[in-house]
Structure formats: C-alpha cells, structure tokens
Amino acid sequence: MTVRIEKRDRVWTVIHSRPEARNAMDARSAEALVEAFVAFDRDPEAAVAVLWGEGGAFCAGFDLKHGASLAGEARPLEELAYPLDERAAAGQLPRGPMGPTRLELDKPVIAAIAGPAVAGGFELALWCDVRVMERSAYFGVYCRRWGVPLIDGGTVRLPRLVGAGRAMEIILTGRKVPAEEAQRIGACEQVVPEGSSREHAEAMAQQIARFPQACVRADRRSVRMQQGLPLREAMRAEWYNGLPAFVAEGAEGAARFAAGKGRHGEFGDI
C-alpha cells in the first residue's frame, strides 16, 4: 500500500510511501492520494491534513520509468489526468498526473517536506496551502532536462507565490531551489531542523484545528478566490465568504472574549 492515513484528533497525516523510488508518483499512488484527500474533505470530524513522504523524500516527481512506457501514446497519457471541467461534467473527481493537484478542497493541507520536492513533486507541494521544509530539502523543475512540462499547476501556482519573474527563472532553468531560498522568496513558510518536518507540520495542523473551522475555511477560501479578481470583487467575495462564518461562530467567539478568554493575544485558553 503506497498511501496510508494516520489520524490524531482532527488532523489527518496522509503518507505517500514509495521510498525505493524517492516517492516518485505512479498512476496507482496518484489515484490513492486523490481518494485519501477526498475522504479527508468529506469527513466532518477532519479539520487539517498533512502530506508527508516517507523515507526522507517528499516526492521526486512523476515516475519517469512509468512515464517511459507511455511515450507516444496519447490515450494512456490522457487517462492519467482529466481537466476540471471534463471530469466534473462526467461526474468524476478531477485528477492530475500527481494525484490531487486538480482537487479544490475546502480544508487546509500542509506539506511536510524532506529531501527533494522536484518536478511534479514541486507542483504537489505548491498545491498545498502551507509548506514546511527541512533545511536540506529543496525544490526544482528537474523535469526541464527531459522534455516533461509542468502540467500539475506549477506554472499557475508558483508565479502566484513568488511573482512572475522569479517563477520564470526557476521554471526555465530547472535549477535547485534550497529551503532557505524558498522561504526567502515566498515558496515556503517554515524551515525546520532535519528530520522534523512532519512533527512541525502536525503541530501547526493541531493549532489550526483548534480554531472555529467555519471561519478558518471562509478565510482560506477568500485568499484563494481573490487571485486575479479586481479589488472591489475580491472585497465583495471576502464579505460573502466571511458573513456566514461570523453568524455561525463569530458572535459566540466575541462573547468568550468578553468573558475574559484570549486576552493579550493568548491562544492557550480559547
């Protein structure tokens, strides 16, 4: 079994385990990851997920040995992934070659990254909401060398994080992007000691899971929706996303604050 799920409280850790291939993705693993994240999104008790690659590598990209067997065959290649609109029209779940990269979840996912997150593995990390990288971890469009394009959101998501110019240079050169540089340019949010990415990602997930979840999801949705919208439309979308959450949770939260909870920025007694 290449994908398994470990649960603690309201946090799911989705583990991709093909260490013999540095967690390179094949079709079976991609499908299993889709199923895992759909189950997570649909579970009312689940709040936050962590994606972690077992064995010291986040993901070395799409398994090129598997891909070589499909060279020149359009039909098998098309069957690896379906665009959002075609899958939706067929009543099927959207899937990319790397698995969940075309899913639009309603809950946050944190990537816990050790070793390489390259080529499609880089795209998989970019699909997540937050990236926690170990000091020796790295990104890179290593597929540049083999004529394999970015088709799992890399050309879409990377510019939104780091800007078009930086993204273009990283994409065109295919060079290695170490963790500290990734954090500096905005492609990663935390750099942590070796061997601790999962621990730190799960700690962050537990913190987020403690908060009122309608509000967490509304704010996350607003951040994602505002990309490319004019300011007025983005502000309107934020309002309509946030209002139901405030009705459901905000008034009760304000009452807890008025009763003395969470004063001076304290998070421990909320």
Show the residue positions of the predicted features.
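Short, active-site-adjacent cap segments at secondary-structure transitions
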Residues: G56-A60, V118, V223
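An acidic, glycine-rich surface segment that forms the CoA-thioester-binding/catalytic face
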Residues: A30-V34, V38, L64-A114, G268
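Terminal peptide-recognition signature
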Residues: V14, R18, A32-L33, L51, ...
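Conserved CoA-thioester-binding segment of acyl-CoA-metabolizing enzymes
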Residues: M1-G56, A68-E73
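Crotonase-fold acyl-CoA enzyme core
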Residues: P100-A214
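C-terminal alpha-helix plus adjacent terminal tail
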Residues: M1-D9, L70, G174-A179, E199, ...
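Hydrophobic alpha-helical membrane-association signature
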Residues: S29-A32, S197, E238
